[in-house]
Amino acid sequence: MTESVYVHIDTTSNAVLTKGLTATDFANSIVHFPQNLLLLDPSASAGEYESHTGLKVIRGTENIQRFFSSSRNRRGFDELKWIDFTDLTMLKELTPLEISELLYFGHMKTHLHSPFFYKLQNNFVYFDLNDQLNRIYYRYLDEFYRIFASKLSSILSDKINVKKSFFKKETPVEKISVELLKEMRNLMQE
């Protein structure tokens, strides 16, 4: 378990740069769970090939949950770079310019225009960066605050109960308020 969490929020693009929050933390705490993923790494081994974009997709929440849980074991081999989308037929409606924007986004890990595509109706864009950093674009920043509150509560619980004896009951830790973290937003910005 990580002992520290680094957070930087860019409210202009709803990008959150973090260290200490994992893909598992993300998957366990989000409310708007992705229906489908478009993997932005052209050499990704997971997923099925989608001919219109030339990228791989993972369809269905069960497959996505398996992908998230297997991503822990693959750490260091494949970079996690993906964007969620709602409808495969709308994915096939992307123009060549929109596909090139997605390719640029995946390669440079930054957006040219908005990180949220109308046709994809995406809520997230997820990038693993080096040194256990990740950048996630959230359509709804409340999703991030829920993940962050859950992670901080988990770290606190581990710290408080680290020297618990076999016979002693674990000390419960109240979940940190999302509203409190929202009030602290200015501390997480430049």
State where each predicted segment sits.
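Structured alpha/beta or helical-core interaction and ligand-binding surfaces enriched in interleaved
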Residues: 1-190
